[in-house]
A protein has these predicted regions:
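Residue-level signal for mature regions of secreted extracellular proteins and peptides
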Residues: 20, 24-27, 199-202, 218, ...
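Conserved alpha-helical substructure of the radical SAM core
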Residues: 1-109, 113-114
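Polar/charged alpha-helical tracts
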Residues: 50-54, 89, 109, 143, ...
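Secreted/extracellular small peptides and ectodomain modules produced from precursors
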Residues: 25, 32, 204-207, 223, ...
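Sequence-level motif detector for i,i+2 pairs with an aromatic at +2
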Residues: 14-18, 180, 211, 270
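Flexible mid-to-C-terminal extensions adjoining Fe-S/redox cofactors in radical SAM and related proteins
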Residues: 1-10, 15, 228-303
Length: 303
């Protein structure tokens, strides 16, 4: 059930510290749980290179320290390399979330650059991984994780499990044996393909959406996070990013999300995951990092 706050308290948004640039819905894979339904038939949306460049400029001007490029598959967007380089020239910290299926040398050169970190998802042994991605992708992703480690590229990996009883420990052990230092476990979220046709609702959110972070979609729509895209709070084609982040629509969306979280019972949290939808977390402190894909968080935008 979605909880609607009848009279939400509108408060000014605190300084945003992180923005997802959700570039595309195109992806080589077609993961059964993909939170935004990306796949081979997806598009890059209506945002142009100029639009994304303006968003980066506005993010830097607003004092936002870092961005994550995500999708879909970032490496399939023709303007992604230019946009990443531009973000770096602005002094923004950059994380690229990739499935690491096909990475050419130009992309490796970019990944090795100062100020760039890498993130990916992993689903376990070969058969389990390929079942999720619906493609024979396991060998490619695993090999490229190892290549990133050997190249000393900072990389974090989210182990995604669909069974609440699965701790993901075997996959974590495998990744750590490869040399990955940052490995977290998270559970599938009830959005996109994983929603099984159900309408999205706030019950599947962690409660920290929009709290110091926001997401910009391929059509320019801004939402509190990559999982809450139906809670649009503005569009960067119509208004500056900073104005949207500090606007009343974002504050109201945050209030609705907070009210939803505060009204549901707490049953604790899953393995290493502060916000799996199979758990009912208590409201997080203001400095919590329970945000999908946020560096250092267990939440993954691939879920």
């Amino acid at each position: 059930m979605t909880v609607i706050a009848e009279t939400p308290v509108i408060q000014s948004a605190r300084n945003t510290g992180f923005v997802w640039l959700d570039l595309t819905r195109k992806c080589q894979l077609e993961c059964g749980h993909c939170h935004n339904g990306s796949g081979p038939d997806g598009t890059h949306g209506t945002m142009t290179a100029e639009d994304w460049t303006r968003v980066l400029n506005e993010a830097a001007a607003a004092g936002i320290p870092g961005v994550q490029f995500t999708g879909g598959e970032v490496t399939m967007h023709p303007d992604a390399p230019h946009l990443i380089k531009h973000a770096l020239t602005l002094g923004l910290a950059v994380e690229v979330y990739s499935n690491l299926v096909h990475v050419d040398e130009d992309w490796w050169k970019l990944f090795r650059g100062e100020g760039v970190t890498l993130a990916t998802s992993y689903y376990g042994p070969k058969d389990a991984h390929n079942e999720v991605t619906r493609r024979p992708s396991h060998a490619h992703t695993r090999a490229n994780i190892l290549k990133a480690v050997k190249a000393a590229i900072p990389i974090r990996v989210s182990v995604i499990v669909s069974d609440p009883a699965d701790t993901g420990q075997a996959a974590c052990d495998e990744l750590k044996a490869l040399g990955v230092k940052t490995v977290r476990v998270d559970h599938v979220r009830p959005f996109g393909r994983a929603a099984d046709g159900q309408k999205p609702c706030t019950d599947g959110l962690c409660g920290q959406c929009g709290d110091g972070r926001a997401s910009v979609a391929p059509d320019g729509k801004v939402s509190p996070c990559v999982f809450s895209t139906w809670l649009g709070v503005g569009n960067v084609k119509d208004a500056p990013l900073g104005a949207i982040l500090g606007g009343p629509e974002m504050a109201q969306a945050n209030a609705v999300i907070r009210q939803s979280v505060s009204l549901r019972p707490s049953f604790g949290c899953g393995p290493d995951s502060p916000c799996g939808p199979d758990n009912q977390p208590e409201p997080q402190p203001d400095n919590g990092e329970c945000s999908p894909g946020f560096p250092g968080s267990s939440c993954s935008p691939r879920n």
